Amino acid sequence: MKYVIIIPDGCADEAQEALGGRTPLEAAHTPAMDQVAADGIVLRANHTPAHLPPGSDIACMSLLGYNPLEYYTGRAPLEAAAQGIPLGPYDWAIRCNLVTIEDQVMRSFTAGQISSAEAAELMAAAQEKLGSERIRFYPGVGYRNLVIYRGNPEEPAPFSADTRTTPPHDLTDQSVLDHYPRGPGSDLLNQLMTDSIGVFAEHPVNLARQAAGKLPATNIWLWGLGQAPKLPRFADRFGLQGAMITAVDLLRGLGALLGWRRIDVPGATGYLDTDYAAKGRYAIQALQEVDLVCVHIEATDEASHEGHLEAKIQALEAIDQHIVGPIYQALQKLDPYRIMILPDHPTPLRLKTHAHGDVPVAMAGSDIRPDEAQRYDEPTAARSARYFPEGWKLMDFFLGRSA
């Protein structure tokens, strides 16, 4: 049996007045997704427990079959795993965004989609000016970077589970004054964030960006900290070998911790300009070597964060044409198979950030008896009697291990 999971990140949304009361999924031309729905079933799942933030880290952990209430320790440790950065028992990983803050308002949580090369230069400057034997700055992908705090038994890190931080993508166009880190260790985090302003102010990268009419990276924003999680390997838990295709370190890290093969796709950017067709091709190739392939696409989520309705629809249509369609055709030649399409969480355009709530799931393949669904969208899922309020249990159902 071959399995494919396709994750159009954050694609679940609300009805839009501009679309005559339809959601982006309803408005988009997605014949391949609709064919999966018609050939199989559409249902609902919830991957965002009410008392945890609706982050992709928590939601994707649940989506991949792991209870976040049991295994989740923070976002940054997952991204550290993606970069191959080892974490000892006293170490903490901290997500480090490069952001643009003007007049204490979060103008851009991506520093204007700063490039990885530019980010690497700024992170090197931060390491030189702010780093130490205990505090290390690590460049990642674009605006997504890391700080690692190296602790030891005699001098443990000052942080704890009570340290509170705010994701910068929750603050777009809002004041940041009430959202700085608080709790144990927050003084250190806030000092690093403040000190980075002086490091970046006259940096050549920012001067060049401003001269080109681009937003500068005014400072770092620290959040999502945690220690290394202890996740059972997917092969031990489910008996299958997997592979992950994504441009986002969070998903790469989850895949690494699960023991999955990492497949890097040329042209995969984690943004709206990603090479959708290449992701589809590489997924089909990977099916020859592993049992399960997971394809994650960030573009739909990024469009919502930016509040771009048309961009979200265009991303959905590109995913359908270049990823879902070719993969579904290839799978049918590899019978037996199963395919599942679902986002991790809703990212409503109205909010420009993640939200708790149900997501629509389309599933088809061997031994899946079709229901009456004809389309893949939120209203169709809402009418389904099948519901997984504990979304991490959905994986057992998808793999045919539960009814």
Q: Which residue stretches match the model-derived regions?
A:
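Feature captures the catalytic ectodomains and active-site-proximal regions of enzymes
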Residues: 1-403
